[in-house]
Amino acid sequence: MDKRTRLTNQIVNGEYFMFLHIPGQYPTTSQESEAGFRLARASAFECWSEATLASYAQDIAEGMHDGRNFMTEKYARIDNLIPPINTSPLIHKIVAIEVNWQEGLRSKYPRFFKQGAGGSDFATYLRSELETYSDRTLQSYFQDVSRAQEEGRNLAGERYLKMIGRLGYKSIEDYERKLATEQAG
């Protein structure tokens, strides 16, 4: 197993443990399907640099050691039940770039996004998740996002492509056509 795969597995395992221990007032569909959770999260992490993966794996290990549950914190932030966890200005910058990428995809693939990918509260969800990251991980992820933007890439599209590829589709367009056929029939 290569280092990226090992780090991704370590992260997904830690996150899934945290998801299983989210208090009852924060039910999530991901808790209902371990396979779906692992698919979505691993697909996202495949787009991260090895440095960002290593940093976030360290965050997960340190958080678990300290008794933190990033998933509980994230959902509490989404519902504005706790004050901001991290106020780094990088969070706003990352969210702005990611929202722009999402909007471009949403207009290009309306059926895919109607299925729940990148819902209307995407910015709140992302901001709440980013607040659980260490400053070290935020800096590394910001470098990943900035590099992708400079190269004209869309990391959101790359994440979705990896996810639907794991489901057996060749492209987002291929999946969008499948959804159009289902809706027409």
Predicted feature residues:
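C-terminal structured interaction module
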Residues: 122-161
